[in-house]
Amino acid sequence: MKTAYIALLSTTLSLAIFLADRTAFAQNEAKDAGSKVFLNEDFSKSEASQAPAGWVVTAPNPALAPVFQVVNFPGSRSGKALLAAGNGRPECFGFIEHPVQLSAKDYCFRVRFKVEGIDDVNRNLTHGIFGTFNDGIFRYRREEGGWIVGENRFRGKEGAGKVRLTYRFAATGKVWWDQVYLGECPPIPERPVKIAVSSGAHKMDFWPGWLDVAGRKKVTIALMTEGFNGKGVDQPEPIDGPAGRLMAEKAKQWKIYVAGAFYEQRWDLIFNSCPLYSPAGALLGIYEKVELFDPEIDQGCSPGHEVKVFQTEFGNVGIMTCFDSWHPETARLLGYKGAELILFPNAGYYLGLMPARAADSGVWIAAASANSPSGIWDSSGAQAGNVKADSSRYCDTSILDYEKDDTNSMITATVDLSRQYSPHNWGGPMASAPGGRRVRQTVMRHLEDDIAREAKRWWDEPAK
């Protein structure tokens, strides 16, 4: 019954977010009107069969140049659209740019278009802002009539820049843009999240007090370690047993999110489970560890079947547990599914993996460890309390504050989820955007297909 309830809750939340996003696009269009950075956003002032006025076409290799021109297009906003089409070669690559002058204000960048013969919008198209800072559009949704809408909001910097639309790697594809909009928008709100992680192994009687400290520190979310209740596979508890009840009660008492991992008995199966409780004390969902360490399997624990993302009031939360971290696919899949913060309860782990897992997938990571150093990392791989340690990291940090409370075995940090930096943020979103942004990949075909095939190959073959 509880599993069915969780599935229903997840479906309801997903539907609500879909409808809210859809409404937001329409509201944003009206709200941003009158603050345009450049005009002719719908190409109504351009002549058919020509490049649109004010835009410059670039093809680094003329032999691979796509076609860019304005065409008459019934059903578009103005009756016209900007067409980009392949030249018959799979290596086809080129872009069209419009100069803009920006300031230290917040901006909305929006496009609307239709495609034909385009397998993957992220692989075949990019929509970027290049200048003293770089950003772009990384999320799209389907709309009625076959239209696709993409939008992003970002904080600008003073200086000249360019809006760039790129067409790449689609031999016979076509795209018709009927809107390319850039304009000022209301200030982007910060999204501060205060995280508490525990450190060290403790007995069950330690945790009520620890959660009280987290509550008094007014954290948003508190994470305990893997096996925090001190029981092994041979002593599993139901989800509403002592460990689960403690988490629910303290979450409700302090109005915070609470998570931690323990061995859960469910029917005739045992899982290494990490439940997540809401500030109301409600069970939002349970993640069952998918990559079990050998002793767990030998002792009767079963692996989970799914990498999950949970919606909370502050953002999307994913979970990976201990040995999951040794496999980059776990964090990457969470990033692909929209996770912003990954909770990482563990008994022990390799510290050096965390900056890579965070930066590769563009996520924040909170690690609570029983036997290794606990920590909190932002999406650029910067560690709270140690943000300048890596000289090869070239960006700001989204970490707002940090405290290491050894007396209470607790680390807290506040991060701003509205600032998703990558390690080389100056390198441009199409070259160094967080890995969770699929558009970062510049391959002609997805390597995931090869990875999936090779991962399933158990027999030796000659190297190719």
What feature does the model see in each segment?
Residues 165-172:
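Short beta-strand-plus-loop segments that form exposed binding edges in beta-rich domains
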Residues 47-81:
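Extracellular glycan-recognition surfaces and repeat-rich motifs
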Residues 266-337, 352-356, 360, 389-399, ...:
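Active-site catalytic loop in hydrolytic enzyme cores
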Residues 133-160:
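Extracellular carbohydrate recognition and processing domains
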Residues 7-21:
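Bacterial N-terminal signal peptides
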Residues 175-187:
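Exposed low-complexity, polar/acidic, P/S/T/G-rich flexible segments that act as propeptides
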Residues 216, 221, 236-259, 325-419, ...:
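CN hydrolase (nitrilase-like) catalytic-core segments centered on the catalytic cysteine
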Residues 41-47, 82, 86-123, 148-156, ...:
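Extra-cytoplasmic beta-strand recognition segments
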